[in-house]
Regions:
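Compact, glycine-rich, soluble single-domain proteins
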Residues: 2-97
């Protein structure tokens, strides 16, 4: 699936990923390929991005906002204050504050 994370200042992430976990208003939930279409409000918390296992990450290009998860270097995390998620046709867009 394709993921794009956008803030008011910049595009923070734009790439193919294996999965994404987000802090929904009623708890964290995860999306994989072919997830049903959804629009959801996000609360403060961590967005967890599961990158492709064969994908080589260059963290210098990520402006220091996305950091590797402490237990798994194939998971990137991004702290958000709030946001909105739209998922449709294997494309997720996160509008993050």
């Amino acid at each position: 699936m394709f993921l794009e994370i956008v803030s008011p200042e910049a595009i923070l992430f734009s790439s193919e990923v294996d999965a994404i976990a987000v802090p929904g208003e009623h708890g964290e939930f995860q999306m994989l390929n072919n997830h049903a279409p959804i629009v959801a409000n996000l609360k403060e918390g961590l967005v967890k991005i599961h990158v492709h296992s064969q994908q080589h990450l260059v963290l210098d290009d990520l402006n220091g906002l996305l950091v590797p998860h402490v237990d798994d270097d194939k998971i990137l995390t991004l702290q958000i204050n709030s946001g909105t998620l739209e998922f449709n046709d294997n494309k997720a867009i996160v509008l993050a504050d």
